[in-house]
Amino acid sequence: MQAVSVVLYLLLAPFAGALLDGMDRKISARMQGRQGPPLLQPFYDLAKLFSKQMLAVNNVQIFLLLSYLIFLAVSGSLLFAGADILMCLFILSTADMFLVMAASSDSSPFSTLGAGREMIQIMAYEPMTLLLAVGFYLATGSFQVADIIRQPVSAVVAMPGFLLGMMFTMAIKLRKSPFDLSTSHHAHQEIVKGLTTEMAGPALAVMNIAEYYEVTLMLGLVALFFLNSDPLSWPVAIIACLVVYFLEILWDNVSARVKWKALLDSCWVVTLLTGGLNGLILMLIR
């Protein structure tokens, strides 16, 4: 069963991520009074990127981007296989470093600046990422995803603060406003694309596929809050994921980009007040 879950994740996660990206573009366009692209536009974009000639800035960049993709795929595979969530999050953090190195491997000042901003974003959300694994252990007594989803009561009952912190840091992780410092998904915000400035053709396609794996992984972590031994918790978890993703899109469209100091301060304060306080309460009542 674990092998089936891993294979399904590896095959279906990019398609699910691309559909969510298409939904993001469509909803964002309607919020801005535009018609927007078709729902399948991300698939058309990938096909066009792969059809272009491979023009990487250097041979190292494509290797680092492939490493970024592979580590994200491995991290998600561990989550959907029911393995150790702590190991899953450690590998996820390692994947981020490959992206920073890929952006830093060329001489473009815009790409280098984007890589530096990405490092700041990692510093901002990483404490919440580690606290998340600790929170699941305090609430369920196990780091194993398979044990967490077999609990009689959903983890969100004991971890509402962690869920709020997760939703906050998810906006940073997915590089959505107001925390899209390293690169932007919207053309009206930034012509120069930060850490993806020198990525084009198949290299940019690999970057996009990696992001589709990442968004699926992040929503999988959201679903983990709502899953339990009751089969009815699965549709509830799916609905919760869609609601959370819609809230991220809404926040993305009503917010202006903040400066890096505001990013660090706000994220660390939210981490302390949500994950830190919730974790302290769980430690006291154990």
Can you say where each PLM-predicted feature lies in the sequence?
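Alpha-helical transmembrane segments of multi-pass membrane proteins predominantly involved
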Residues: 1-286
